[in-house]
Amino acid sequence: MDKRSENGNITLTAGGAIAKGEFVKFSAGKVVKCTAATDAAIGVALDGAAAAGDIVPVAVLGSFTGTVQIKAAGAIAQGAEVTPEGKEQTSAGTTELICGRALEAAAAAGDMIEIAHAVCHTK
């Protein structure tokens, strides 16, 4: 781990390109963006990383009280549970993980919305 701050944010080395607001997970000692609802997200990128080796600040899920902005991967209803790929959780009782609840709606992929975050868990 590269650096820890007092507010639950850490800086980590990116394993590839990451956009601001994307959920990230560990992979080979670095962080990469989550691409599946079953990915074990550790946080949300607070800034983007253009390429592998770049340093990216990450808000660690569940490590502080508050909210964080995510980049939606599709439409999300206000109040919906959000998966690590940035989508609305729609399949109750599956292996999809839930990492937060949308505090505002996203109309389409790419929208930045605020979520109340939590350590990822199943229903």
Mark where each language-model region is.
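Surface-exposed, low-hydrophobicity beta-strand/loop segments enriched in small/polar/acidic residues
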Residues: 1-123
